[in-house]
Regions:
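Sec/SRP-type N-terminal targeting helices
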Residues: 47-51, 64, 109, 120-147, ...
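Periplasmic alpha-helical coiled-coil/stalk elements that build and connect Gram-negative outer-membrane
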Residues: 3, 30, 58, 149-262, ...
C-alpha cells in the first residue's frame, strides 16, 4: 500500500509539473534520486512486470478456488413429441409370444437439478498451488531486475548530461579566451607588431573553439534526449538537473572491497527461483501417481405429465443422491516418468548455472572494484593537475595583460588548462560510473 501511495504521488507530481510546463513554460527540476524515482514510476517494462506479478497472484487464487465446493444448478425442459419405443421380450407379458413394443414416459418433462462436488484429495491441485507460488516469486525477482537495470541506466544517463553540461561551460570559456587573444592579435597586427600568419593562427584557434562548443552542445542535447527516454517523459519538456558532478563524487564511498554475496544479485536469485520451480514441477508429476478423490451430491426434482403443468405440485417428483468418486492412475505410457526426468535434468542445469554465476559474480566484483580504485586514483591525479593548471593560467593571464607574456605562450598555457579540465571532468564521470558498476556487481544498487 505504501509503495502504491508513493507511486501515485510521483505520477501526480510529474503530471502537475508537465501541466505547468505546458501552460507557463516552467521546468522540471530533478535531483538524481528524484530522477530515479520518477523513472521507476514511469517505465513501461516495470509496469508490465508489476502486472505479471498480479497475474501470477490471480492464477494462484484461481487454483486455490478448486479446493472450494463447486455448486451448479440446471433446469431442463423437454417436450417428447414422439416417445421412444422399447421392446419387451416374449413372455414378459402373459400370453405374448413375440417382442412387445411399449412406450414409457410423458410428453412433458421438466428437470431441475443442483449438483455439488468437493475435493478431498487432489495431488494436481496442491502441486499447481506450489508451482504458482514459485512462479510469483520468480516474477518478483524479475521485477527487481527491471528496477536495478533502470536505476543503472537512469543514473548513467544523468551523469552523462552533467558531464556534457560542464563540457559546454569549458567550451564557452575557451571561446571567450580565444576571442580575447584574437582581439589583441588584431590590435598588434594593426600596429605592425604581429605578422599575418600568427593572426591567422589565433583566428583558427577561435574557429576550432567554436566548433568544440557546437559539438559539446550537440552531445548535451543527445544525452538529454537519452535521459528523457530513460525517464519516459515528453521530449518537449525541459529538465534541470539539481545535482552536480562534484557533489555526487564527494558523496560516494571509496572504501571498496572484493567480498561478494551472490545471493544479493538478482541473476542468482532468478536462477534459484527457476531451479525451485523445476523441482516443484518434478514433485508435482511424481505426486500425480496418487489417486484423486472427491465427494459429489445431487438433488433434483422432476415434473412429468401429459400436459404442461409446472405449477401442479402433484406432478413433481424429487430424488437425491451422494457419493465418493476416485480416479486412480494405472498406466499413462510413461508420460509422467519422462516429465519427471526432464525436470530433474533442468534442475541439474540450474545447479550448474548457479555455480557459474557464483564464480562470474565474484570475478565481476573484483574487476569493478579494481576499476573503481583505478578511476579514483586517476581522479585524484587529474584534480591535482587541474588545480595546478588553474594557478599557472592565473599567473600567465596577468603576465599577458601586463605585456610580459606573448599570446603564443598564453595559448600553450591555455591548451594545458583545457587538457587538465577535460581530464578532470572525465575522471569524475569515470569514478561515478565505476561506482555504479561496482554497486551493481555487489547487488547493492
Amino acid at each position: 500500500m505504501k509503495a502504491f501511495i508513493t507511486y501515485l504521488y510521483l505520477v501526480l507530481l510529474f503530471a502537475q509539473s508537465l501541466s505547468g510546463f505546458a501552460q507557463t513554460d516552467t521546468s522540471i527540476q530533478l535531483s538524481l534520486n528524484q530522477a530515479i524515482d520518477l523513472g521507476l514510476a514511469q517505465r513501461f517494462d516495470i509496469k508490465n512486470q508489476e502486472l505479471a506479478i498480479q497475474i501470477s497472484e490471480s492464477n494462484r487464487e484461481k487454483i486455490q478456488s478448486k479446493n472450494l465446493p463447486q455448486v451448479n444448478a440446471s433446469v431442463d425442459f423437454r417436450y417428447n413429441a414422439i416417445l421412444a419405443t422399447n421392446l419387451l421380450p416374449p413372455g414378459f407379458i402373459a400370453g405374448s409370444k413375440e417382442y412387445t413394443p411399449v412406450k414409457f414416459g410423458t410428453p412433458y418433462n421438466t428437470l431441475t437439478t443442483i449438483t455439488a462436488t468437493q475435493n478431498i484429495f487432489n495431488a494436481n491441485v496442491s502441486g499447481d498451488k506450489l508451482v504458482s507460488q514459485a512462479q510469483k516469486e520468480y516474477d518478483q525477482v524479475s521485477l527487481e531486475k527491471y528496477k536495478i537495470d533502470a536505476k543503472s541506466a537512469i543514473t548513467q544517463a544523468y551523469y552523462q548530461v552533467l558531464l556534457n553540461q560542464e563540457q559546454i561551460k569549458l567550451s564557452e570559456e575557451n571561446v571567450a579566451n580565444a576571442e580575447t587573444i584574437v582581439k589583441k592579435g588584431e590590435s598588434e597586427f594593426a600596429n605592425g607588431t604581429l605578422i599575418k600568419t600568427d593572426l591567422s593562427r589565433y583566428q583558427l584557434d577561435l574557429s576550432n573553439a567554436k566548433n568544440q562548443l557546437q559539438t559539446a552542445s550537440r552531445n548535451y542535447e543527445n544525452s538529454m534526449l537519452s535521459l528523457k527516454t530513460q525517464l519516459i517523459v515528453p521530449f518537449g519538456s525541459t529538465i534541470i538537473l539539481t545535482d552536480g558532478l562534484e557533489n555526487l563524487i564527494n558523496g560516494t564511498d571509496q572504501e571498496a572491497n572484493s567480498s561478494s554475496n551472490p545471493e544479493q544479485r538478482y541473476e542468482y536469485r532468478m536462477e534459484s527461483s527457476m531451479m525451485r520451480l523445476n523441482e516443484i514441477q518434478a514433485k508435482k508429476y511424481n505426486r500425480s501417481y496418487l489417486p484423486s478423490i472427491y465427494l459429489y451430491g445431487n438433488a433434483s426434482i422432476q415434473n412429468q405429465n401429459s400436459k404442461f403443468t409446472p405449477f401442479n405440485t402433484n406432478t413433481w417428483y424429487p430424488y437425491a443422491y451422494v457419493g465418493v468418486h476416485a480416479d486412480i492412475p494405472i498406466f499413462d505410457g510413461f508420460e509422467k516418468s519422462r516429465n519427471i526426468t526432464g525436470y530433474k535434468l533442468r534442475t541439474l542445469q540450474n545447479k550448474n548455472n548457479l555455480e557459474k554465476l557464483s564464480y562470474d559474480i565474484q570475478t565481476e566484483t573484483v574487476n569493478t572494484r579494481n576499476q573503481l580504485s583505478t578511476a579514483y586514483s586517476q581522479y585524484q591525479t587529474s584534480k591535482e593537475n587541474y588545480l595546478l593548471a588553474q594557478s599557472i593560467m592565473t599567473v600567465d593571464q596577468d603576465r599577458f595583460n601586463q605585456g610580459t607574456l606573448t599570446a603564443a605562450a598564453l595559448k600553450n598555457t591555455e591548451y594545458s588548462l583545457q587538457n587538465a579540465q577535460n581530464n578532470y571532468l572525465t575522471s569524475i564521470y569515470n569514478v561515478l560510473v565505476a561506482q555504479v558498476n561496482y554497486k551493481k556487481a555487489k547487488g547493492e544498487l
